[in-house]
């Protein structure tokens, strides 16, 4: 909404922004799923009768409603990741920041969690991801910002970033191998080739 957050307190920012850590085991602190998702609301002093419907809604969105009364220890790593996301969604943030959302996951769980985040984004939640996974960046992010030495050096689509040799070099990134292929075989506009390839891949395997 174009708001400058510099003048806001941490408490004020926390009502707008949710943060999900890379490892859910470092974030989860309650043994039961319901209590974990309800924790933030209880800390804010929300009445118990108001908490349950908010928790139920967050669990439903995250596909965890059947596990409401389960212990967290019974879940897979990917499901635990969703519990941490649900705990943030229960607080109704406008922006969700995720640190390496697919770290340590196989292709199946990688796809599952990214498709889930894509759906959340389509429902109106702004998603910001911190990632070193360049394929994920190409496949799922319409917009990318590159930071090097504490300064923003790139602000464009993921395809434009990863087909820009100057930005990639300054940030110690590699241009995508698709870009290298396009250059090698003499394609006039490598960025268009890369985008078309990614679009085709998504259409084929989803």
Where in the sequence are the language-model features?
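A short, surface-exposed alpha-helical micro-motif characterized by mixed small hydrophobic
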Residues: 137-139
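H-loop/switch region of ABC-family ATPase nucleotide-binding domains
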Residues: 131-132
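ABC ATPase NBD Q-loop/coupling interface
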Residues: 1-12
């Amino acid at each position: 909404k174009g708001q400058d957050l510099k003048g806001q307190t941490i408490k004020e920012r926390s009502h707008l922004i949710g943060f999900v850590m890379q490892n859910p085991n470092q974030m989860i602190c309650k043994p039961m799923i319901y209590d974990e998702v309800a924790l933030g609301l209880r800390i804010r002093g929300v009445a118990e009768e108001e908490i349950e419907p908010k928790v139920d809604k967050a669990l439903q969105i995250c596909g965890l409603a059947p596990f409401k009364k389960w212990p967290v220890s019974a879940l897979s790593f990917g499901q635990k990741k969703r519990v941490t996301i649900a705990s943030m969604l229960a607080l109704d943030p406008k922006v969700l920041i995720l640190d390496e959302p697919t770290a340590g996951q196989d292709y199946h769980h990688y796809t599952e969690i990214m498709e889930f985040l894509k759906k959340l984004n389509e429902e109106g939640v702004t998603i910001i991801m911190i990632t070193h996974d360049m394929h994920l960046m190409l496949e799922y992010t319409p917009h990318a910002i590159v930071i090097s030495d504490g300064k923003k050096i790139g602000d464009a689509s993921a395809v434009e970033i990863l087909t820009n040799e100057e930005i990639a070099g300054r940030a110690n990134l590699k241009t995508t191998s698709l870009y290298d292929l396009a250059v090698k075989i003499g394609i006039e506009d490598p960025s268009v080739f890369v985008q078309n390839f990614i679009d085709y891949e998504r259409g084929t395997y989803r």
